[in-house]
């Protein structure tokens, strides 16, 4: 996403488009943008910044490539809406790792952070560490080993961008649904992710 911003600023549109098309291929293959294109990291995604790449490229590309990118964007959005939703209706970071991988991640965190998880559920700790990895905030104090419990503002803002972009540029028959989803997310973010003060 951020490399593409530089490529576009440097008028290397074709290079930026090829980056986005490569990601679109992976999204269509897996349903999401893998954390890395290696088998061991397919249990978690990247944050959904692909939509930013699409928005940045739309003014420069033809209809055929726009359709490919928007289709991948919609597929990734559907993944987040089916696999990473909290009871409040907002999205969260997570993973699909097995128990063994989660326990391994807890062990890895103990070594990296020089911290012992006494009497803790190692699988739960590992689950949340992998969720932090999905967020891009690997081994940081941001989520206090409870990442999968948070409706992260950045994540939900990125998905709001998906909803508004797909409403504007996606299939016309789905426009009303995406507008409603964006309005619902906006209301929930004000309700659950703010301190109640006027944010406008």
Model-derived segments and spans:
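Substrate-binding groove/exosite segments of carbohydrate-active enzymes
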Residues: 1-51, 55, 151-153, 164
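Structural helix-adjacent loops and short alpha-helical linkers that scaffold large soluble proteins
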Residues: 8-20, 57-74, 167-186
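Active-site acid/base region of carbohydrate-active enzymes
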Residues: 63-150, 195
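Alpha-solenoid repeat scaffolds
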Residues: 29-30, 64, 87, 173
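Mid-sequence acidic-hydrophobic segments that form the walls
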Residues: 26, 30, 53-60, 76-83
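Catalytic cores of carbohydrate-active enzymes
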Residues: 77-98, 157-200
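C-terminal capping/lid segments that line or modulate ligand- or cofactor-binding pockets
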Residues: 44-64, 193-200
